[in-house]
Structure formats: C-alpha cells, structure tokens
Design a protein with these regions (language model features):
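DUTPase catalytic domain/fold
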Residues: 1-157
Length: 157
C-alpha cells in the first residue's frame, strides 16, 4: 500500500529537506530540479563493477533550463531518506508528460539516503525553471531482507 503525502514529507524532512507546502500531495511529495547534466563520455556496467560516464552540468539561463530534444540527467533538489520498511518510486508529474517529456528512475531501496538522480527524456524542446516540480516521490511498505548499502549511498550530499 502506498503512503500518504504527509508520511513521505516526514521522511524527507528527516533527511533535511526543506519543503514548500505545495510540494506535499495527497499520495507523495513533488521533487524539484536541482541540477541538469548531459553525459559526455561512455559509462561502463560489468559483472565486476560499474562506472558512470563523465557529465557536464548545464547552467540555467536567467533561472531557466532551455532543453532541446534529447536525454539528460536531472539531480533532484531534495535530500531523500527512504524508511527502512519502505521502497520509493519517482514518477513524472503529469505536466511533464503533457509536454512530451518523462522521467525514468530505478527503485529507491529501503535505507537509501542521498540526493537522487533520474533520467529526463525530452521528446520536444522545453523550458524548465530551476527549482520547478517535475517528479513525485511515493513510498510503499515493503518486506525485505536488509537495507540499501550500495555505492550511491549518501550521493550528492
């Protein structure tokens, strides 16, 4: 079962997030654009390890990211802490979808802490203001063995 937006907001508050009242929704919390990147070199995913390719951070023009069609990495503006008895998912806000764009993210495991990232696919050029709400974090109760202890723990803090 998914939790209420108030439960998600409390989890983010415990991670140090300063949320605006409008970010708390009935079933989750809106995440904002903290930074946007383009990937500039190949990454590597092998059986024995991984490497994320180099990136270039885009600078907003007068507070706005003017994005052409393509794939970007977005870093969210809020620190996140997934409670140990939950799993997190980030879904795109409907206005993003209605403008031909989407967000892709992986499962956010129980115990993950950090300032997460996702893939922003822009199907047609769009202007996105820095700090704009683009995704919604939802939490669901989950049974599991252990908590997240991977290489991305504490990322971007």
């Amino acid at each position: 079962m998914f939790e209420s937006g108030a439960v998600v907001a409390a989890a983010l508050g415990a991670a140090g997030a300063s949320l605006e009242p409008a970010q708390t929704q009935p079933n989750g919390v809106d995440l904002t654009v903290g930074a946007v990147f383009t990937q500039t070199s190949r990454g590597r995913i092998g059986r024995d390890g991984k490497h994320v390719g180099d990136r270039t951070k885009l600078e907003p023009d007068d507070g706005w990211y003017q994005l052409e069609a393509g794939t970007y990495v977005v870093r969210y503006g809020e620190p996140v802490r997934i409670p140990t008895d939950h799993v997190g998912f980030v879904l795109p806000r409907s206005t993003l979808l209605r403008n031909g764009c989407t967000l892709d993210t992986a499962v956010w495991d129980a115990g993950y802490e950090g300032v997460g990232e996702g893939r922003l696919d822009v199907g047609h050029g769009i202007d996105i203001e820095a700090g704009a709400r683009i995704g919604q974090l939802v939490l669901a109760r989950a049974d599991h063995e252990g908590t997240y202890d991977g290489t991305y723990q504490g990322e971007n803090r």
